[in-house]
Amino acid sequence: MPEFNIVEHTCDICVVGGGLAGCMAAIRAGELNDRVILVDKSNPERSGCTATGTDHIWAYFPDIQKTEGVSLDDLVEDHVRSLAKGLINKEIIHYIAATAYDRILDLEGYGMKMRYADSTLPGNFRLQYQLHSCRNTLHFDGRDVKRVLTEQVRKRGVKVADRVMINDLLVHEGQVAGAVGYGTRDGKLHVFHAKAVIMAAGRPNRLYKTYSGLVFNTRMPPALTGDGKAAMFRAGVELINMEFVSIPGRWSSKNLVRGGGLPGGSYQPCGIGVNGLDEVIRPRNHEMGQWQGPATPFGTDKTFMGELKAGRGPIYADMSWGSEQDQTYMHWAIANEGSGSCFHHLNQQYGIDFRKHKIELWPLEPEHSAAAAGGPIIDGKCQTSLPGLFAAGDEAGGIPQSVVPGALTMGHLAGESAVAFAKQMTHVPPGGNFDTLLEFSSQVKTRMHGDAWQEAQSFIQNVMSDYNIAYRSGTMAQRGIDSLTYLKQNMRLSAANPHEMTHCLEMRNLIECGEIIFRGTIERRESRFRIFTRLDYPERDDANFFC
């Protein structure tokens, strides 16, 4: 077995993941404790789902919602019933709704612009309808939110270990003792000994084939490969709802996938949907400044797929509608949301103009995010079933559609909770072993002329796309498990450098997540709305599967 250079780190709080949740956890923990380390697979300045910005966040705005007759409890109940369909951690979603406004004020205090002179609402906030039945989604200048948060992380004395991919947790006598990761640039193994760990590594992307055929052309960051969920599972942490799938049903720009509302967020108020005959098939759902109700989802299989099957494709987003004020607002919003700035590059480079050119749309690949919300079950303090281990944001299970406010608020709460836990301990526990990770990495490192990680990636995506979406059933899921087991037992990955080693470690985690999803599918013998369907169990079974 070849020797790896091992770098030891010791801290009280180890935060895994530098997205919104991880940064907020590090900020809050850093305010209460001077021995905090933030570990990020990339660079926290531009990592996570808001790496290139976000233009919206929902919250309860007391001065606005109260005048409209909406209480905090009303908003929570709306979220529970309409978005989560009852399957949600009510204590956490109440906390999110109650404190999201405070986190917005935090962002404003960090220097982000949240108020606008053209708004007539109390506080000069630009609010839209989006997810809920009340107007409570704030549009703001969020392009550089990650840079701002990373600056705040460093100001609090938090040590940042970037370019380190956490692979496994250290466990000692039934309690978390830290985490171990691989340096994606230096090729070293980094061992973090800690009293408490906050897991905020995000969702498992890259499980399914993309419509463009490009592995990394995904709506959300392709670097998110379920590393945290796989590590927690290997450590014996209880996971829930991993079998749930969000999307298909949403559409995005063809061959240039981007996140963000389409058009319920960034694209309103200009966007409409038209077919190949230029017939309007998805009208505008409100005029600028004249919101009538919650935004209509722009792309649904029922409408858009129906047009394609009827021979009336392609499908386009036509943003030429609306006044100059509408256009200005839309361009501002898109520039702050996800990879929307790519459109401005296309405008400058190729003359693409929303006022003149329609944007072709195509379905998005399936995801395990948003409405799906699979991950570790957490209590009201964000603690998982493993003492000392906390989870926040997309990492946590059972909080559908918590999105940006969920990341900010749960990160803040997890930071406080982890510090409180660490205070009870007199010393950092001795580290557990990571022999399995060391053995896997050593084999990949020394193997000559082995399998490329791309081959394993293609295998995984074929298996997940074939057996877990359109034709999902118990027998199909078992076939999926058998296929992933064959891959795990027979693949002989090799890596010539740290970059390739990182991708090989990602394959290890994707296989783990895929198998968890299939096993969850077998156990959930029912169908539940759009997030989970089984052809052999087409009916909902609340008696056995509703909590």
Go through each PLM region and give its residues.
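N-terminal Rossmann-like FAD-binding beta1-loop-alpha1 element of flavoenzymes
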Residues: 13-38
